[in-house]
Swiss-Prot record:
One of its GO terms (biological process) is biotin biosynthetic process. Its EC number is 2.8.1.6. Residues 46-270 form the Radical SAM core domain. Catalyzes the conversion of dethiobiotin (DTB) to biotin by the insertion of a sulfur atom into dethiobiotin via a radical-based mechanism. This is Biotin synthase. The gene is bioB. Its cofactor is [4Fe-4S] cluster; [2Fe-2S] cluster.
Length: 325
């Protein structure tokens, strides 16, 4: 570290969007509080004191054909969860109306590699109703979509969500029924059409620091607008849970998670880094510190796990001096 004049070196490179992988590895050696301070300085450089709030509805749960090792909705895992087909559009609209008083964004999320024609058309109807009856920005996580579907979603001003989940070199350790390149192809197609894309991953799946940093740079190369960071929440019955239970991989620590979030922001200074699932379980009493480095927060319940009380999250944001919603 002696070759650098101090943390100002990293700050200057970050605001110029010029941090390289060597810089990112060196950043890891800094204390978590220094990294959070740096990330917050970068946020303030971009005149951002805001924490943009989003929420999701698990509109179709379980029975997924894909074998993602971390996912409780996969048929290849044995987790005990609620399974149900696509919810009626009335239920989706009801949830959207409820969350509007707290959130800017609302995402319709479904299980599965993709949606069939009937499901797709029903989701389109639900999106139109939400657009008509609320002021929410609408997002959708519908798996791998074709060109015509993406164009229709673009016309409706919908942001697409499609997580890479992890880096290219680690992807086949967590999923083999579809590929990393399948995801990249879908994201690239969406970007080419002009859609905004939210794509991030899950940290704490047993990946190395190098894997994690590579994921952040892969997202940077794809030029996605939003980067949701999830922290793996062990759910019994998933293969990743068994790896943790057998000590084949280590549980991520709160400090490791905070450092990863801060480094992500420093690598992607002009993008919206959003903290999502697993924060309650993994960060515990350290959750408020994450606000220094993030641009957005997912509130409410997640896919198959509960979030914490929304009012508590709002209070945390206000108490920290941040602007919410």
């Amino acid at each position: 570290m002696e070759e650098f004049t101090g943390i100002g070196y990293f700050y200057k490179k970050s605001i110029k969007n010029q941090l390289d992988k060597k810089d990112a590895s060196l950043l890891w050696e800094l204390p978590y509080y220094t990294l959070l301070y740096l990330a917050n300085c970068v946020k303030k450089h971009n005149n951002s004191n805001n924490i943009d709030l989003c929420s999701i509805i698990n509109a179709k749960s379980g029975l997924c054909s894909e074998n993602c090792a971390f996912c409780s909705q996969s048929l290849h895992n044995s987790s005990k969860i609620k399974e149900y087909p696509l919810k009626p559009k009335e239920d989706i609209l009801k949830q959207a109306k409820y969350i509007e008083k707290y959130s800017n964004r609302f995402s319709i999320v479904v299980s599965g590699k993709t949606v069939n024609d009937r499901e797709y058309n029903e989701i389109i109807d639900a999106i139109k109703d939400i657009k008509k009856e609320t002021n929410l920005k609408v997002c959708a996580s519908l798996g791998l979509l074709d060109n015509s579907q993406l164009k229709e979603l673009k016309d409706l001003d919908v942001r697409i969500h499609n997580n890479l989940e992890t880096s290219k070199e680690y992807f086949d350790k967590i999923c083999t029924t579809h590929t990393y390149d399948d995801k990249v192809k879908s994201i690239t197609m969406a970007k080419k059409i002009g859609l905004e894309v939210c794509s991030g991953g899950i940290i704490g799946l047993g990946e190395s620091l190098e894997n994690r940093i590579n994921l952040f740079y892969e997202l940077k190369e794809l030029d996605v607008e939003g980067i949701p960071i999830n922290i793996y929440n062990p759910i019994k019955g998933t293969k990743t849970y068994e790896l943790l239970n057998n000590n084949a991989i280590k549980q991520i620590t709160p400090i490791e998670a905070l450092k990863s979030i801060a480094i992500c922001k420093l690598i992607l200074p002009n993008k919206d880094v959003r903290l999502c699932g697993g924060r309650e379980y993994n960060l515990r009493d350290w959750q408020s510190l994450s606000l220094l480095a993030i641009d957005g927060l997912m509130i409410g319940n997640y896919l198959t796990t509960n979030g914490r009380n929304i009012e508590d999250d709002i209070k945390m944001i206000v108490d920290g001096g941040f602007d919410g919603k």
